[in-house]
Design a protein with these regions (language model features):
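Non-catalytic, conserved peripheral segments adjacent to functional cores
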Residues: 1-106, 127, 134-191
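Conserved metal-binding segment of the jelly-roll/cupin
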Residues: 103-127
Length: 191
């Protein structure tokens, strides 16, 4: 397992070690011990989620507020996505900035998104199957969301805006500047 830093502290790309031969391949998708040793992050994932989405689908931007905030570890089993994490920690030097990483069945990369970030993705290839681990349970009362096409964030989703397939619920998400309840950069959400 190899850990790559991104432009935003805490958002990490994980590249597993792949073993290939004439039979196919094998890799360890996650090891809690190795992850903690390589990153210094001690988190315990308690829920696994899976979604299937067609090319052109955009999901997000979603987050859960404290005390139900979630870290996520996202990977693609089939297809390809552009995975996006937006820093929504007030006071952060990267507040309002985002990281976008292509995750695919070919590159086997994973994206670790810490608490304090909004998450979304667009489907670039195939009928994408996305799996993600969460370190806190889903809590509908703590749901938060931001419009995927917020001009202030200016996220390049690698999709044509008027052809994006977005849920009715996500179309109603507020703009970033309208979100009153976000995170505080100086608060430890893992304590």
């Amino acid at each position: 397992m190899r850990i790559l830093k991104t432009d935003i502290e805490g958002v990490l790309i994980i590249e597993p070690q792949l073993f290939e031969d004439e039979r196919g391949y094998f890799f360890e998708a996650f090891s809690e011990r190795k992850f903690a040793e390589l990153t210094g992050i001690k988190t315990r994932f308690v829920q696994d989620n899976e979604s299937r989405s067609a090319v052109g689908v955009v999901r997000g931007l979603h987050f859960q507020l404290p005390p139900f905030a979630q870290s996520k570890l996202v990977r693609v089993v089939r297809g390809a996505i552009l995975d996006v994490a937006v820093d929504i920690r007030r006071g952060s030097p990267t507040f309002g900035r985002y990281v976008a990483v292509e995750l695919s069945e070919h590159n086997h990369r994973q994206l670790f998104i810490p608490r304090g970030f909004a998450h979304g993705f667009s489907v670039l290839e195939g009928d994408a199957i996305v799996e993600y681990k969460c370190d806190n349970y889903y809590a509908p009362e703590a749901e938060g969301a931001i419009r995927w096409d917020d001009p202030a964030l200016a996220i390049d989703w690698h999709t044509i805006h008027n052809e994006a397939i977005v849920s009715a619920k996500d179309k109603l998400n507020p703009l970033f500047e309208e979100c009153e309840r976000l995170f505080d950069y100086n608060t430890d959400y893992y304590a």
